[in-house]
């Protein structure tokens, strides 16, 4: 009997001693699984972006000649008509959303942090890679036209929306990303960026 009690005590001690190691192993497994999931999500987003830009539909093929101004062998009026037909609008029909959300989409995380000292920003728009806009952001691109004071130029917000959704609906073979056409931005996100460009309270127009 005494031997059985001692055996039970030793067994209990062994189980207790093993628990922390077992829990640590499980925690490590959870961490690894989370890290792998995060990596897969990043890869899937990057892959989606690469596929979108490399998609060779008939229009992309027509614009693949780097020295041409208009699509080769295509009626320009028909080209623009078909590009306009691809444009989808927000469910509520409003092409002007929330400029603050638009600003967060337009700025990279590091740009947002530098301006406001808190988390925000996104890789989705990255507008300042090609444009200047907010005068506080000095490191900006010049591939596209300046966006400073954009809301004071009398441009129809719907035209701005369409230009972002599918630039080829206005300028065939434009080098600007077709954000909506390729699904890089949702209609609602594009509406928020339109607000960022047009709203009088936006830093773009200050």
From Swiss-Prot:
Signal peptide region: 1-17
Residues reported in the UniProt entry to bind heme c = 127, 130-131
Does Electron transport appear among the keywords? yes
| GO CC annotations, alphabetized | plasma membrane
Could you tell me the keywords of this UniProt record? Cell membrane, Coiled coil, Electron transport, Heme, Iron, Lipoprotein, Membrane, Metal-binding, Palmitate, Signal, Transport
Which residues bear N-palmitoyl cysteine-type lipidation?
A: 18
Report membrane topology. Lipid-anchor
The record ties this protein, via Gene3D superfamilies, to: Cytochrome c-like domain
Organism placement in taxonomy: Bacteria, Pseudomonadati, Aquificota, Aquificia, Aquificales
Cytochrome c domain segment(s): 97-201
Could you tell me where this protein is found in the cell?
A: Cell membrane
Residues with a covalently attached lipid (S-diacylglycerol cysteine): 18
Segments forming a coiled coil: 21-58
- GO MF entry, a single one: electron transfer activity
The answer to whether keyword Membrane applies is: yes
| Superkingdom of the source species | Bacteria
PROSITE patterns the UniProt entry points to? CYTC (PS51007), PROKAR_LIPOPROTEIN (PS51257)
Q: Which InterPro entries match?
A: Cyt_c-like_dom, Cyt_c-like_dom_sf, Thiosulf_SoxX, Thiosulf_SoxX_II
Q: What is this protein called?
A: Uncharacterized lipoprotein aq_1806
